[in-house]
Amino acid sequence: MKLDNTSKEIILKKSEFLLHNNFKLIEITDSTITFSNKKIAFVIGYERHDNVSNINIKFLQENKMFNLGWIAFVRRNQMPLPQNKLDNILELLDYAEKNHAKVTNLQFCQDSREMVEDFLK
């Protein structure tokens, strides 16, 4: 699914906190918006062939990527996220802004992945 121009504008506005935290807008494609500070990348996007949206956090030097949707889910006591693609992205950006120091910490993300794996067992 493509990001329409209105959604892109809304997402870019909601992502301004990343710019204030020394991230730069790196790329905008039909389905993703990417911010990076050369160590970590936030890849915000819609799945190409599905009605799903998500934000991935990639630790570039370590070459490790984490799904912010799952992190938010397990860290917020399994509170479900909105089903609307744009609302889901905005909710995840809000979570990332409020928990910026945590979600940009590799250990926090790794611990969250373990929580997800335990949840899925």
Predicted segment positions?
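Hydrophobic strand positions within the blades of repeat-based beta-sheet folds
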Residues: 18-19
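Intrinsically disordered, low-complexity regulatory regions enriched in serine/threonine/proline
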Residues: 1-13, 25-121
